[in-house]
Amino acid sequence: MERLTDLPSIGPKLAGNLEKIGITSPEQFRTLGAEEAFLRIRAQVDPTACLHQLEALAGAEAGVKKSLLPPERKAELKTWYQGL
C-alpha cells in the first residue's frame, strides 16, 4: 500500500486534504492518527470538515470502511467531535 487512496474510506478529495497538511503516505497518516489529521485539516484546509470526514479518517486508520467502524468507536468519535 503506497497511496493514501489505497486506504479504506480515503477518496481523492480526502487524500488531497491530507496531502495539503503534509501527509503523503499511509505510514505518515497512521503515525499522525485520525483525530490529529482531522484537526489539522480543519485548521489548515477545510474549517467545515464534518463528522463523516472524521469517521472516514478513523476507518482508514483502523483499516476498515467507515461504515464498519464499531458503534462504540463511532460514539467516541461523535463525542470528541462535539467537544471541538
Residue ranges and their predicted role:
Residues 13-21:
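Catalytic DNA-binding helix-loop module of base-excision-repair DNA glycosylases/AP lyases
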Residues 38-67:
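Alpha-helical interaction/regulatory segments in DNA maintenance proteins
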Residues 32:
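Short alpha-helical DNA-recognition segment
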Residues 60-63, 67-83:
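DNA-contacting surface of Y-family translesion DNA polymerases
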Residues 1-8:
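Sterile Alpha Motif
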